[in-house]
Regions:
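Helix C-cap/helix->beta junction micro-motif
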Residues: 29, 61, 99-103
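SDR active-site strand-loop-helix element
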Residues: 11, 34, 66-70, 107-113
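Rossmann-fold cofactor-recognition segment
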Residues: 36-52
Length: 130
């Protein structure tokens, strides 16, 4: 029973940002927090890079919002593992958008523009980083 609380699905919740989201929202919302690495009792195992599993899990939970936090952030890892980084940081985000469009719910996505020079208002996957 959700006690009339909105439901939020948080993908990629195993890091510091995910824990901060959990602490802020745990008492006000019905949460499902997932990550590939389960390091807390409130996190369920899910690899959001697997579109079918991600879609199924989100649809079963029936959230009002989807928060997608997961990404590779270690620049050295990203440079040496470009295919995995692309799958994780780009394709999985696109899949999250497809899922939210299908369910007609908002997506909340947090990323960084810290690798760019700040001269443009918006950036895309093809902009050259610093």
């Amino acid at each position: 029973m959700m006690n009339n609380k909105d439901a939020i699905y948080i993908a990629g919740c195993g890091g510091m940002l995910g824990e901060a989201f959990y602490k802020v929202f745990e008492n006000s919302y019905h949460l499902k927090c997932t990550d590939i690495s389960v390091n807390e009792k409130w996190i369920s195992s899910l690899d959001f890079r697997d579109y079918d599993e991600y879609r199924r899990d989100v649809k079963e939970f029936k959230p009002n919002y989807l928060v997608h936090l997961g990404a590779h952030t270690d620049l050295e890892y990203c440079e040496t593992n470009q295919e995995d980084t692309y799958i994780t940081n780009t394709l999985a985000v696109e899949n999250a958008v497809y899922i939210t469009n299908e369910l007609k719910i908002p997506i909340i996505y947090i990323s960084t523009a810290g690798i760019f020079d700040g001269k443009k208002d918006t950036y895309d996957d093809w902009d050259i980083p610093n």
